[in-house]
């Protein structure tokens, strides 16, 4: 694992960015797309 900057929020860590953009779909797959999706959709 690469070293992580503790000052960065977890979803800003390198390598944690989802490969696809967030969308407005509320299905289970899209709700678990990333932490931001999970917090706003779940």
Curated annotation (Swiss-Prot):
Entry keyword set: Acetylation, Activator, AIDS, Apoptosis, Host cytoplasm, Host nucleus, Host-virus interaction, Inhibition of host innate immune response by virus, Inhibition of host interferon signaling pathway by virus, Interferon antiviral system evasion, Metal-binding, Methylation, Modulation of host chromatin by virus, Modulation of host PP1 activity by virus, Phosphoprotein, RNA-binding, Secreted, Transcription, Transcription regulation, Ubl conjugation, Viral immunoevasion, Zinc
Site (Essential for Tat's translocation through the endosomal membrane): 11
Region (Interaction with human CREBBP): 1-24
Region (Cysteine-rich): 22-37
Name of one Pfam family that matches: Tat
Cellular component aspect of the GO annotation: extracellular region; host cell cytoplasm; host cell nucleolus
InterPro entries to which the protein is assigned, alphabetical: IV_Tat, Tat_dom_sf
Name of protein: Protein Tat
Organism phylogeny: Viruses, Riboviria, Pararnavirae, Artverviricota, Revtraviricetes
């Amino acid at each position: 694992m690469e070293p992580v900057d503790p000052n960065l929020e977890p979803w800003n860590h390198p390598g944690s960015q989802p490969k696809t953009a967030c969308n407005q779909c509320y299905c289970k797959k899209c709700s678990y797309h990333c932490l931001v999706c999970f917090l706003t959709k779940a």
